[in-house]
Amino acid sequence: KWAVEQMNNAINASGHLGISPMASFSGALLFHTFYPWPQRPTGLVEEGFKELAKRWKPILNHADSKGVDICYEIHPGEDLHDGVTFERFLKATNNHSRAKILYDPSHFVLQQLDYLQFIDFYKDYIKMFHVKDAEFNPTGKAGVYGGYLEWKDRPGRFRSPGDGQVDFKSIFSKLSQYGFEGWAVLEWECCIKSPEQGAKEGAKFITDHIIEVTEKSFDDFAGAEIDKEQIKKILGL
């Protein structure tokens, strides 16, 4: 009850401020069972997402009344941690119009998910964007699960923007191509660089990647008025 009240308070505040997208985590009823051994009981996943949707739908309805989108950060440790789980949740909420996505490519690098194709699949749902870098360098000793290593020693670790493996040029291009109108928000976590240097470099990094979207085609100068007779001639009609 307390958690629902806090979510609704945050929604109210967002509505008063005229801010439509609001970030959140989904919570986790199922994540501790994500590895399929021991075998999951039949129906567990379906029931888990049904319950998750049951808890979220009143909040999503309240968000709708305030004109606010709930943007779930697709994040490890949460039941919504990739595209498949987001789709499961969306279906369980009857495709609620206020269920959206906070896109953070760093989490996809660490689970080896195609973060560029993710944009193609979910462009209509992405309403928030974290500019956060990461790298994944597996060894013969550790991989995605990390072996309980400290951050600086993990194969998958977060880095300051520009120091990792995320192709931000392609991300900014895709988001611009699809008409993303939200903020590019610096979320900084790095186990090597200082936060002061990261903040200074990060602001410039984002500025340098912002694309001023063109309002015309580059070859418009060669365009011409429609000439039906010329068209027929070209087609041999």
PLM regions: where:
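Active-site acidic/histidine proton-transfer and metal-coordination neighborhood
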Residues: K1-K100, K232-L235
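Histidine-acidic metal/acid-base catalytic patches
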Residues: S20, K57, S65, D82-Y103, ...
